[in-house]
Amino acid sequence: YGNNGEAFNEMKRISNALTNLGYNVVREKIEASYWHTKAPFKEDGDTKMPEGCYFEVHLNIECTNEKLNKLNQISKSTNCHLSKNAFKIIDDNTFTIMMTYRSYEQMFEDFEEHLNFIKDTLQFNQFKLEKEIIEFAIYDTKINHDKLWLEA
């Protein structure tokens, strides 16, 4: 969508359609690229995250049963959330699992610095990063919806 208004209208259209079908919509959310105009960057003179917004990164990591405890330790020590379920099964012992880091306060440069620390820690411990998706949430009706999930 070309602008925030169009994205918001499409989100509302989908939400209303689901409600009309009898579904209980518990959350409405719009995620954008991290370079969205609303995203805070120090180089632009920003000093504060816009209200209700946050940066988030999803890391798909190749793991084995033997290394899962180590990955869990890394996740906790870097303030990340490690998914409870495998994202993709590769073989009987190897799988891809998702690790998520979210920041409600950091400017992008600080977020990126911590992300690089996470990736360096994974590489040092010989984990293979398969995919990285960085997002900027510009609208979220339940910003604390994932709070328990992220802290688990």
Regions found by a protein language model. Name each.
Residues 1-152:
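Long, contiguous binding/interaction regions
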